[in-house]
Structure formats: structure tokens, C-alpha cells
């Protein structure tokens, strides 16, 4: 039988620890769409302490829906190197254009970003901005 007290305590303590460790950051990113996720990945990979805040339950923005509500997206040649770095499959459609499974793309960049050290907080709205010197 599962002990709900242990489950609740584990969730609350773990999340609180993650949140408290993110009170001082090098970079805070608002919005976990494709741009926010890639920015978080690149900054965390570079060794910065980064957290990403998303007001919705799910991250990835509209990319889940792909193009025309088909879960396929098209990227151009300039993005191919990043997709390769993220181990996301890109199939050549025609010269300079690649087709990518939208679900693989959102999932792939999310996993790589988290593994690089990005902390993601969904269901959090950001209302104020503080910029500190240095």
C-alpha cells in the first residue's frame, strides 16, 4: 500500500529545494516556447545558472501542434546543426528544408535542456522584472 504522506512529502520537499536553489540566477527566462527552451539549453550548457518560467501546464508553446495542426514542423538549413546537437531527427524534404516530428522536437530539446542544468517551473506567471548590474 502506498503511503500518501511519503509521496506528498517527497514532492513538496523536492520542489521546494529546486525553487529555493533558483532564487539567485544568472538568467531567468519567461516563456517555455521553442525560443525559451533553446535559450535555456544554450545558456545552461554554457555553465550559467538558468531557470525558465512557464505560465501554462505544458512547455513547448504551440510547437506540439506542428504546422496546420499536424504534428510535423519544417525547419531550414540554419537550424539543422542545433537539431543534430540535440539528437533530434530531421529528414531532408528538399534542398534547405527539413521535416521534424514536433513531439520529438519538443521532447528532445526539453530533455537536453534539463540535463544541461536548466530548471523549468511550469504553472508560474512572471509579473515583474529586476535587472541587476554585474
PLM regions: where:
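Extreme N-terminal leader/targeting segments of oxidoreductases
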Residues: 1-27, 112, 116
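Short hydrophobic core segments
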Residues: 28-30, 53, 126, 134
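Feature captures the FAD/FMN-dependent oxidoreductase FAD-binding
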Residues: 87-134
Amino acid at each position: 500500500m502506498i503511503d500518501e504522506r511519503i509521496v506528498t512529502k517527497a514532492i513538496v520537499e523536492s520542489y521546494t529545494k529546486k525553487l529555493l536553489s533558483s532564487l539567485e540566477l544568472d538568467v531567468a527566462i519567461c516563456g517555455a516556447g521553442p525560443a525559451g527552451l533553446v535559450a535555456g539549453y544554450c545558456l545552461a550548457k554554457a555553465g550559467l545558472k538558468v531557470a525558465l518560467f512557464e505560465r501554462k501546464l505544458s512547455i513547448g508553446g504551440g510547437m506540439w501542434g506542428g504546422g496546420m495542426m499536424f504534428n510535423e514542423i519544417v525547419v531550414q538549413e540554419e537550424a539543422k546543426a542545433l537539431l543534430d546537437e540535440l539528437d533530434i531527427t530531421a529528414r531532408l524534404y528538399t534542398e534547405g528544408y527539413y521535416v521534424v516530428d514536433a513531439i520529438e522536437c519538443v521532447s528532445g530539446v526539453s530533455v537536453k535542456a534539463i540535463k544541461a542544468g536548466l530548471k523549468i517551473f511550469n504553472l508560474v506567471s512572471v509579473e515583474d522584472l529586476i535587472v541587476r548590474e554585474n
